[in-house]
Amino acid sequence: MARDDALKDKIIKLGNKQKVSAVIKYSDHPNPDIRMTVAMTLGMIPTYDSGMALIPLLRDTDPMVRASASTAAADIHAKHCEEYVKKLAFADNDPNVRQAAKSAFDRLKSSVV
């Protein structure tokens, strides 16, 4: 548990330094909490590459990762994620994911970049 907390802190620090490629390396970590942290961190880095890295996380098996990725996509105005977020908002099995994705989708479709 302590190792995971330390890894989450490391990922957030990498995000604060805008190190997208270093953050992306953890996007396939076996622990969903780590992948969720990756999604949230990518939401702090408003680049095309961050948005592209969110796409696999929007398809993650864990609902909290999908919800975090949809929110992160809206946070960075990743218009190229809009269709993926829309699918989650209207078709995901998990009601929490649908709620987070619906909010994110509304923000994405109204944002102008």
Tell what function each PLM region has.
Residues 1-8, 28, 59:
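HEAT-repeat alpha-solenoid elements in large eukaryotic scaffold proteins
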Residues 14-27, 45-59, 78-90, 110-113:
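Amphipathic alpha-helical scaffolding segments comprising HEAT/armadillo-like alpha-solenoid repeats
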Residues 63-76:
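Mid-chain, well-packed structural core segment of small domains
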Residues 30-31, 61-62, 93-94:
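Short inter-helical turns and helix N-cap capping residues of alpha-solenoid HEAT/ARM repeat scaffolds
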Residues 87, 91-111:
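Short, Lys/Arg-rich amphipathic alpha-helical interaction segments
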